[in-house]
């Protein structure tokens, strides 16, 4: 599909047995529109629905999807976005302040996968509890929850690589220390960034954009789930 608008936010929402990610995406869209009423938002989902006051575009995955591992469909975002410049966001997030300045920073690259995360005190997270495979394999500390790309050969190469890793996971898994049984998007993005070149698709020196991560060991909660 060819882009029909210059820039916008793409929210990926595939419902699972345990989580209604489409509902999460609606809340995220509301927070984006609160700060930026004119922001353009596209919902990418496997559940048919019409555009509305929250979603200017609704797209279904353009290729057959992997039902066993919903993460493995992520490479399709490159082909599904209606925007020439896209910021992809995970559905289970909130935007708590203006983010329009992100575009200026991110345009320094054709692709930018966010690096590192912060705790609820807005400090760089120090816990590496969830990042053993990254540290053991010297992978870039990327978080796909915020990913930017513009229509370009570099972005196409990146997402072709992402697809290749997902579809050939046993071969990649065999090369890793402490590998995951099923590939997570963060690990796949980290491997893809290593292949394409971290200097090409990450900006670890930048203070933003980063997510505030609310996992137990990052926020030093005593139990999991900490909201109970």
List each language-model region with its residue ranges.
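Conserved catalytic core of nucleotide-sugar-dependent glycosyltransferases
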Residues: 104-166
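Catalytic core and acceptor-binding pocket of nucleotide-sugar-dependent glycosyltransferases
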Residues: 139-228
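N-terminal cationic-hydrophobic initiation segments that often serve targeting/anchoring roles
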Residues: 33-34, 78-79, 103, 193-194
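Short, polar loop motifs at secondary-structure junctions
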Residues: 44-51, 97-99, 206-207
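GT-A fold catalytic core of metal-dependent nucleotide-sugar glycosyltransferases
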Residues: 60, 70-124
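Aromatic-acidic/polar surface patches that form glycan- and anion
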Residues: 14-25, 67, 136-140, 178-185
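Catalytic phosphate/metal-binding cores of nucleic-acid and nucleotide-processing enzymes, i.e., regions
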Residues: 16-18, 23, 43, 80, ...
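N-terminal anchoring/stem segment of glycosyltransferases
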Residues: 1-66, 151, 196, 225
């Amino acid at each position: 599909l060819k882009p029909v608008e210059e820039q916008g936010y793409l929210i990926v929402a595939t419902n699972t047995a345990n989580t209604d990610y489409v509902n999460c995406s609606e809340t995220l869209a509301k927070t984006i529109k609160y700060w930026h009423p004119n922001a353009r938002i596209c919902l990418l989902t496997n559940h048919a629905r019409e555009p509305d006051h929250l979603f200017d575009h609704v797209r279904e995955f353009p290729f057959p999807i992997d039902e066993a591992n919903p993460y493995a469909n992520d490479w399709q975002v490159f082909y599904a976005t209606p925007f020439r410049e896209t910021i992809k966001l995970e559905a289970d997030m909130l935007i708590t302040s203006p983010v329009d300045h992100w575009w200026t920073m991110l345009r320094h690259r054709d692709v930018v996968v966010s690096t590192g995360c912060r705790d609820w005190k807005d400090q760089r997270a120090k816990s590496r509890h969830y990042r053993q495979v990254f540290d053991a394999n010297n992978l870039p500390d990327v978080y796909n929850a915020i990913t930017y790309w513009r229509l370009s050969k570099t972005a196409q190469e990146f997402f072709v690589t992402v697809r290749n890793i997902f579809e050939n996971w046993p071969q990649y898994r065999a090369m890793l220390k402490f590998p995951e049984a099923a590939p997570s998007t963060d690990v796949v993005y980290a491997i893809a960034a290593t292949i394409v070149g971290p200097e090409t698709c990450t900006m670890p020196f930048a203070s933003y954009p980063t997510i505030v991560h609310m996992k137990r060991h990052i926020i030093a909660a005593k139990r999991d789930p900490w909201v109970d």
